[in-house]
């Protein structure tokens, strides 16, 4: 499905396979319903960012266990803690 311009606010994406897709980062995608698979995938992508901010690194390290449950973590590589 072509979701360009779609308002995903409060959308239920539980069970959706969003591999190789683009997640919109605008207000219309806030408050969606997701299952653990998608939440881990989004957390993994968040944790894979190269950001040197101390607050980001603290947050990142605190959710690594969850993020590394991403269904493709074996293929993409387990993320390790970073020092501040």
Task: Identify the residue ranges that each predicted region occupies.
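Intrinsic low-complexity/IDR segments
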Residues: 1-4, 9-84
């Amino acid at each position: 499905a072509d979701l360009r311009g779609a308002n995903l606010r409060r959308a239920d994406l539980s069970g959706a396979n969003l591999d190789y897709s683009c997640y919109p980062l605008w207000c219309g995608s806030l408050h969606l319903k997701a299952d653990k698979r998608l939440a881990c995938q989004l957390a993994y992508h968040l944790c894979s960012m190269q950001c040197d901010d101390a607050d980001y690194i603290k947050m990142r390290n605190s959710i690594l266990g969850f993020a590394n449950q991403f269904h493709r973590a074996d293929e993409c590589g387990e993320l390790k803690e970073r020092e501040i």
